């Protein structure tokens, strides 16, 4: 059986990255998948080669208007739209259609949190698309509605989750994520001009103001039986893509007790917890020794590179993760979820190998 795929918001960074990955997917290469409607509200009628010249195999195609009736003709629909747009379209699509939403509309389970951070009506929540979180892989495989996580929550969640689950830290977590400019999307703004970003790094929406903060807390709360406190600070850096996250938290009483007996054993325990937690995960690479994650190493891949350290003097666990914000942070996660929901190998069309330099 051949399945048809549509991408709404195809001309944005996330949408075009989904298309790039679909073009190398084994199902597409074997003729078992077709790429149908490519839609974009502001680019309808324009050619793919004019807007996305890098997608050579789609040259000759034209961007269509985003219309639910057209999307409903497909078996799988990726929604790569700004928040507030996906919910309206999703309610018009058939129940049997696999809908994978790359926006924020269905990520938060708490209505009050949604209303506090977003300026559109609450639409409910769907199964959440980080397969590496305990229990989520099964939920993703048994649904036709999937909420792809935000890019910052992906890097932060995967960095902190093992430490919380293994009770290595107290749930008072400081997270700083350095991101490339593609995370802001294609919409022009003064702050994203080259002259504003080149040679400069700056924090923004600090102090709990960023919309991904409640999503990070929601994810980490699943692994903790007491309230999780998160201070999240995003930092814009002069690079095109990638997110480097550093999370730190006070050591738990158990880890402190071990430290007082044998500091070296405490450090080993932290690293061992991460290796054990991710031992069966294809896309999570826990680095050896003192090697640290770098955004360049994951460029173009669906991999997450992680290093966990224990600062004995400060009694803090410090974890760093690196992802490509457009792959594991968005499009790759969407493809990974599609594979699970369709019963295909989870890594189909996805690489753990980055591009360097």
Curated annotation (Swiss-Prot):
One of its GO terms (biological process) is L-arginine biosynthetic process. Catalyzes the NADPH-dependent reduction of N-acetyl-5-glutamyl phosphate to yield N-acetyl-L-glutamate 5-semialdehyde. It is found in: Cytoplasm. Keywords: Amino-acid biosynthesis, Arginine biosynthesis, Cytoplasm, NADP, Oxidoreductase. It comes from Corynebacterium kroppenstedtii (strain DSM 44385 / JCM 11950 / CIP 105744 / CCUG 35717). Belongs to the NAGSA dehydrogenase family. Type 1 subfamily. HAMAP family: ArgC_type1. Its EC number is 1.2.1.38. This is N-acetyl-gamma-glutamyl-phosphate reductase. One of its GO terms (cellular component) is cytoplasm. The lineage of its organism: Bacteria, Bacillati, Actinomycetota, Actinomycetes, Mycobacteriales. GO terms for molecular function: N-acetyl-gamma-glutamyl-phosphate reductase activity; NAD binding; NADP+ binding. InterPro entries: AGPR_AS, AGPR_type-1, NAD(P)-bd_dom_sf, NAGSA_dehydrogenase, Semialdehyde_DH_NAD-bd. Pathway: Amino-acid biosynthesis; L-arginine biosynthesis; N(2)-acetyl-L-ornithine from L-glutamate: step 3/4. The active site is at 151. It catalyses: N-acetyl-L-glutamate 5-semialdehyde + phosphate + NADP(+) = N-acetyl-L-glutamyl 5-phosphate + NADPH + H(+).
């Amino acid at each position: 059986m051949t399945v048809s795929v549509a991408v709404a918001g195809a001309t944005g960074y996330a949408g075009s990255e989904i298309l790039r990955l679909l073009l190398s997917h084994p199902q597409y290469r074997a003729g078992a998948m077709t790429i149908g409607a490519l839609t974009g509200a502001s680019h309808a009628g324009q050619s793919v080669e004019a807007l996305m010249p890098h997608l050579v195999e789609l040259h000759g195609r034209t961007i269509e208007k985003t219309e639910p009736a057209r999307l409903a003709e497909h078996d799988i629909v990726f929604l790569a739209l700004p928040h507030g747009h996906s919910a309206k379209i999703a309610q018009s699509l058939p129940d049997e259609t696999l809908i994978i939403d790359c926006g924020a509309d269905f990520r938060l389970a708490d209505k009050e949190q949604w209303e506090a951070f977003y300026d559109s009506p609450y639409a409910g929540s769907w199964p959440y698309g980080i397969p590496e979180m305990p229990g989520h892989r099964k939920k993703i495989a048994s649904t036709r509605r999937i909420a792809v996580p935000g890019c910052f929550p992906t890097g932060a969640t995967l960095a902190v989750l093992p430490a919380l689950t293994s009770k290595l830290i107290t749930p008072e977590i400081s997270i700083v994520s350095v991101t490339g400019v593609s995370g802001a999307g294609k919409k022009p703004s003064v702050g994203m001009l080259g002259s504003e970003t080149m040679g400069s790094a700056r924090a923004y929406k600090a102090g709990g103001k960023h919309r991904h903060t409640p999503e990070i807390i929601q994810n980490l709360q699943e692994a903790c039986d007491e309230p999780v406190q998160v201070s999240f600070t995003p930092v814009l850096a002069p690079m095109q893509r990638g997110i480097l996250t550093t999370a730190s938290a006070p050591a738990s009483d158990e880890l402190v007790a071990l430290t007082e007996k044998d500091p070296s054993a405490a450090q080993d325990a932290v690293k061992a917890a991460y290796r054990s937690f991710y031992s069966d995960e294809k896309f999570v690479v826990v680095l050896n020794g003192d090697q640290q994650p770098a955004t360049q190493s994951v460029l173009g891949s669906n991999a997450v590179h992680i290093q966990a350290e224990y600062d004995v003097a400060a009694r803090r666990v410090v974890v760093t993760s690196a992802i490509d914000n457009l792959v594991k942070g968005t499009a790759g996660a969407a493809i990974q979820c599609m594979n699970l929901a369709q019963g295909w190998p989870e890594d189909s069309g996805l690489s753990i190998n980055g591009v360097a330099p």
